[in-house]
Amino acid sequence: MFEAANRDQSVIVHVGRSGDTRAVQLEPAAMELPDRELASRIVRLNTLAYLRSQLAIRREMEANRVEGIAGRLPTEPQVNAYAATIDF
């Protein structure tokens, strides 16, 4: 499982190895957010968790010397750049 959470851990999203959403955990602080903001945070965190799952697959493929993955799976700098946008 791959996880992404906001700073105060009030919104946590878990995705499986294939990138499928497995769970969304909402703490009381998250329930105080306006609907649009909460939805936006869930989507953005889900995207980050998905990117992390895809990066793990990329690393496995690189370790196994699989060719042709360059443009199909995210790199670590790409995932880190997206993670840096999670400013909440």
What are these regions (language model features)?
Residues M1-A5, S10-V15, A23-F88:
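Acidic, negatively charged sequence signal
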